[in-house]
Structures are given as C-alpha cells and as structure tokens.
Amino acid sequence: MNISKQTLERALDSASFPVVAALLVHFTGDISILDKLPKPNQAILGETQGFLADKDKEIIKEIALKEINRFFSNSKADEIYIPSNTELNKMMNFIVGEEVSTDYIPMMLNDLNIATHPFKPNFIKATSNLEVLIIGAGMSGILAAIKLAEIGVQYKIYEKNNDLGGTWYENQYPGSRVDIANHFYSYSFEENHQWTEHFSRQPELLDYFKNCFHKYDIHKHTYFETQVTDMKFDELTQEWSVDSICHGRENKERIGIVISCVGQLNQPKIPQIKGLEHFQGDMFHSSQWPHFDAISGKKVAVVGSGASAFQIVPSIAKFSKELTIFQRSPPWMFPNPQYHEEVDDRKKWLLENLPFYSRWYRFLLFYPGSDQLLDSLFIDPTWKARSDSINEANDAMRELFTSAMLEQISDQSLVEKVIPDYPPFGKRMLQDNGAWLEALHLPNVTLLSKEVECMSSKGVVSSGKELEFDTIIFATGFKAQNFFYPINIDGGSGSFEKIYRDSPSSYLGITFSSLPNFFAMYGPGTNLAHAGSIIFNSECQINYICSAIKYMLSNDLKVMRVKPEIEKQYQDRFDMRHEKMVWQHSKVSSWYQNSKGKVVTTSPWRLIEYWNWTNNFNQDDYEF
C-alpha cells in the first residue's frame, strides 16, 4: 500500500487524534508509545477529540506522520501489529480517557473485531430441511438473513411493502434522517466509509441496506408485497400454519420456525379526531408522504412535535405559505452541532485507507454512548428540588439543555412553549443543531401548545376557533404497543393480541412462553432510549436466535419454547426496574408506555447486561 506523505498530512487535519494516537500502537508494535503522548480527557457523546489542546494534537500528528510513513516504507498493510487483548484494553482506556470497566472489555472487543483481514461471512451449506420464515425486510430482517445463511439455515423473507428497507423505506418525509452517528449506526461487520453526513438522511440509509441486501444475495429469498395475516401453531405437526396474501392471492403453508422482524414502528398512528373524514384538503401521516407537492405555497398544519415533526418542520417551513404546529408537549433536545454536518473527504480517506482507523473511530462513538447515562435515569426518591427532574445529575442536564435552548430564543413568547415541564430523557431525546428553533422564529410559522379538538371540511378547530389549511400532516407516531400487528398469532393457547393486549410478556424481548418456535427482533421491551443503537440490539438478538436454532438442529429437536417461570422472572425484573426509572415518571406520557402508563416498548437494561444474556444461550431456560 502506497500512502503519500502529503495525502496523509492533509487527511490528519480532519482526524480524531485520540484514535490516531491509539493507531500508533499498530504501526510501531509498541504499547509504551501511549505513555509518551498527550492524554485525551474523558470522552463524552459526540466529542471525538478528547478535548485535546491544539498543541497536543500537533504533537500526535507529527509523531503519526513519522511512524505511519516509516511503516509503509518498510512493511505491507497486512503486516501491521495486532495487539494482545491486554494491550487493546490499554488502548481503549487511552482513547476514552478513563478506565474501561473489565465488564465491558469482551463486548467492546467483539464489536472492535481487530483482525488482519476484513470480515468475510463464512456461509455454510444447508444440511437440514429446516426453513425459517423471516417476516420483514428491514434492518433486522436483512441482518437475520445474513446470520442464518452463515450457520447454514435456509430462510425466506415475506415483506409487506414492494421494496426492502422497513423504516428507511417508509419514512421518506423531508428531513428524514438517523439520530445516531452513522459510523456506529451500521452493521458491525459491514462498514461504510463513504457516508456523506455524520447523521445520514433517509435515501443514503436506504441505499446502505439495499447494498447489504444484494451483496448477500438476499433478494433470491425475498417475496415482496406479501403480508402475513394469520399464524397458528399446530401441536400435532409441530409447525406453524401460516396464512399470507401475496400480490392479492391467498397462500397457506407450514413453517418450522418464524422470526418476526416487523419491529415496533411500522403501523402509523392517526389520532381519532372528530370530523377527520370531513377535511377536503390533503391529509396524510408522516410515514405515508405523498409523491406530489402538498407543501409549496400552501397553508400547512403539522400535528405533533416529536421526532418526525422535529425533522419535517425545518425542512418545509420556508416553502409553506403558512405553517402551524399543534403541540401536545415539547421535546427535550441534546445540543449537537454535527447533526447536519457533512463528512469531509479527508475523514472518508482516513476511514477507507488507514488500517483500523474505522474500527477505533466506531469504538470512540460506541463507548461514551453505551451505559454511562443510565444511572442518571433512576428516580432519586429523596429528590424534592423540582418536579421536572429526578435527581441531581438529571437536574444538571435539565439546566444544560434549557440554557442551550434559551440561547437560541429571541421571541420570548416561545419560551414557555418549548421548555418541557417533565424530566429530561423521559421521552425520546432529539438532536439539536438549531434548525428546530430557527424554524419556529420564521414569520410564517406558528407553534400552538394546543390539541386539535375536531376537524372541519376546511381545517382544524382548536380552542373553539376554526383554522383553515390546505394540507394536514400527522406526525403522531406509531402504534408501538400493538406488537406484531396486524398479524393474528396463536401459539396454541389463543390469540397473542387478545391474551396480552398492550402488556406483552416475553423473555429478553425475543421468545415467548405462549409462542413455540417463534422469535422476535426489536420485540417488546427492546427499544433503546439511553444508549447504543437499535442495530446493536438486533445483532445481540440474532446471535441469540442463531445459537438457539443451532442447538435445536444439533440435538434433533423440533420444538422449543421458553419456560413460563423463566419468562415471568425476567418480566418481573423488567417491570420492577422500570418502576424506578424516568420513563415511568408521573409527568411523562409517551409511546414507551401502554394504556396503563406501564413501559412496555423500551429496555431498562445496561447494554452490557443484554449483550451478556444474549451471548450465552442457556438451554435450561427452555422446554424442548
């Protein structure tokens, strides 16, 4: 590999210097070099320079130029030094400016995956007649297909839409983008060094999953426009009887194992507003954005101010004649100036060409965003200072986020409308680069802290006054508590929906005592609101599922279901932990909760806990 000194020098100007410092161990084979370099401070989410002073960055850059050029003058890329696990741990400590707990080292090493050669799936030829049905071709479904193929298990995918992508296919509204840094929001084994933005927009994310879909030949096993409608487990044949509709034709078949990859956020939720059917203008949910222009020069209403509205409003405000937002409660926002920033070409070059740079950069994004926040999300029962915070640390964050918002507000009438009255992190935390509040200051934009009372043929009635609109957008979220809807699933003891309603019971959010030979990805209680990315959780889940299937095949077992007592123990611990956390606070109402105010969608666990549980399949937890 030939790297010019000039190219490297230019690229290093855009580098993360804690990462570059750690790379010097690879290039020199000397762990002690870290003792001679300026030390980064403790890493925080989104800060990739370790708060190093400019002079310290220059010191690291100068040494890096010397050592990297020396290495490539005398060695080949595949001769680079692979540190021992002990040395890798020291490198981790250096990069994040603190001692990485020994509890986390196996998980971080697993994700880091330092090896001389990039990941190549080792697909095994199928040796059994088992065929697994995967429902859904979104992020989790694609992942499940890749991992099943790796262990030699046949599969097919039924996807209700006419294309793949799930969330990133359906949510094509203006401004749609991920709110987890892209170099971590990706499969751990399938890096993309060419992301154009740090938090990519929907089209680029969809392209990423399409590339994975075709790279791993998943298209050969996928049936689009196929909606599973009913599933019933037959105890006699020990198989699922599955009904589906494919291109309008009904189909019935028998399947040994089913993996649901439908997720939680796929059924649009439109509020039941009196007179909804009378409105004569354009009206749609944010995830069903039309292909015609319903915005330009129009009077537009956006109902909701959560994650989707937060992205839509700044994107359409300048094109609308008038834009009115109906807000039930304001969101908390995490200051993030990088939210809309592009990844410059020099950063892309480092990620693509400097060995292990991308792996360590991913680690630097991962670790500060893993479990450090979780302790501050537990309610301190002695905390009496304020009702809009739950403990001292949470209150400090409330002050920080409030100050960041106040600095952006020149119209004082907005203050009461945009500062939440519930604790930070009680609802989904949004990424703030100033675009939301800037849009609210535009002369054609109005924020109303009022709910829609009813609708008329011309628009909306609120506070007894009719407001006329050409277009109404419902940014009102999804039916997250209706797990597996609209599929009617009966594991032999009755309909899953009728048994559990909106209070499902599961083990790890993956298996269910009432549903044999059935697994879920992004199932109940596995949404992440404090750490990581949903892809991390999905990788945990499919590793567990594959371990279970391999155990069944190697022991010639046809049926497995989690023991009811194991499920109950897990669910009791899940519920008890949530009782102490911010998401079940008395001032919080969100899609994390069911109709009784009980959290059912979101994980209360540390990532390391969940990784350990899913990394160790225990057959004693199951009946076969």
Q: What is the predicted role of each segment?
A:
Residues 169-216, 229-239, 256-293, 338, ...:
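Catalytic cores of eukaryotic secretory-pathway lumenal/extracellular enzymes that build
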Residues 58-67, 183-213, 217, 363-420:
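Conserved N-terminal/central alpha/beta ligand/cofactor-binding core
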Residues 272-283, 460-510:
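Central helical "cap/lid" subdomain
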Residues 1-130, 207, 251, 269-287:
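Extreme N-terminal leader/targeting segments of oxidoreductases
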Residues 375-457, 462, 466-488, 571-624:
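C-terminal catalytic lobe of FAD-dependent flavoproteins
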Residues 122-129, 134-150, 154-164, 169, ...:
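Rossmann-like dinucleotide-binding core of oxidoreductases
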Residues 1-18, 24-27, 32, 50, ...:
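C-terminal, flexible cofactor-proximal segment of oxidoreductases
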Residues 56-101, 197-265, 454:
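Feature captures the FAD/FMN-dependent oxidoreductase FAD-binding
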